[in-house]
């Protein structure tokens, strides 16, 4: 089952400047489209700052573009000036060489939070990942309060981001909702996806809920649709007012036989294909 995303941002929202990092990426584009529909229909989020390493060529009238590399601390401080809230979708999105992940996801997250502190920004919605717990066995039910079991450098970098979020809340009052996102793609592609899929409309609903909920402190939630066989807890959804509406079940007959090689870590662990990546050569 899938839902229409047209009305997925209908909750009351503030009118201040919002920043989306990683605006040129797949998830950034989904959010920008949703915000554009919201502005056209209801006049909300009139000022949207969008950022990526490369220029965007499809800017809306409501969008202000700032080209910025997450690893550039000074540039990040400029990027956050005047920003009330951040939806952080930027960074390295898949498992790869540690050095690449270090610069984008570790140095980049430090730069983001330090810039937010200096700018007085008080809310971050962080794209964390299910790969923070990707070494749990497939089928095991996992909640945010269980020990981390990252499945690679990427998962470790997202665990680092969650740690930074906690520290910057406890010391400086910057609230964060860490979204341990599942498989955010147009449709589930394999048997794993029957448990991990997060539809685009549910992703938009989740992000908006995390952005607008009051008094979240530092909260970690899993981002997944209403899949009957999902592996992850709904803990924290009630705190932000998120309800998943879509389900991967509509593709079960088509994809349930699409599995990873028997006996491989990809078939055993929740991280799936990420368990088949690496080790990587020393030079990059």
PLM regions: where:
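N-terminal Rossmann NAD(P)H-binding glycine-rich loop of SDR-like oxidoreductase domains
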Residues: 15-41
């Amino acid at each position: 089952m899938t839902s229409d995303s047209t009305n997925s941002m209908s909750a009351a929202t503030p009118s201040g400047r919002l920043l989306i990092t990683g605006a040129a990426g797949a998830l950034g584009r989904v959010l920008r489209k949703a915000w554009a529909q919201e502005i056209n229909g209801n006049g909300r989020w009139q000022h949207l700052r969008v950022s990526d390493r490369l220029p965007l060529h499809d800017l809306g009238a409501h969008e202000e573009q700032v080209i910025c590399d997450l690893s550039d601390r000074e540039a990040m401080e400029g990027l956050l000036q005047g920003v009330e809230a951040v939806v952080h979708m930027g960074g390295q999105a898949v498992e790869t060489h540690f050095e690449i992940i270090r610069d984008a996801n570790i140095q980049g997250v430090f730069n983001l939070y330090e810039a937010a502190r200096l700018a007085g920004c008080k809310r971050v919605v962080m794209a964390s990942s299910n790969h923070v717990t990707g070494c749990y066995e497939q089928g095991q039910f996992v909640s945010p309060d269980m020990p981390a079991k990252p499945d690679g450098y990427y998962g470790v970098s997202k665990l680092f981001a969650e740690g930074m979020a906690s520290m910057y809340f406890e010391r400086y009052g910057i609230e964060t909702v860490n979204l341990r996102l599942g498989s955010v793609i147009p449709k589930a592609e394999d048997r794993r996806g029957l448990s991990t899929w997060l539809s685009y409309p549910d992703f938009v609903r989740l992000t908006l809920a995390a952005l607008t909920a009051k008094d979240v402190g530092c909260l970690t939630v899993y981002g997944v649709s209403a899949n009957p066989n999902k592996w992850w807890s709904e803990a924290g959804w009630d705190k932000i007012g998120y309800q998943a509406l879509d389900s991967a079940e509509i593709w079960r007959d088509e994809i349930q036989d699409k599995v990873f090689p028997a006996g491989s870590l990809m078939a055993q662990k929740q991280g799936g294909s990420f368990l088949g990546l690496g080790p990587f050569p020393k030079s990059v």
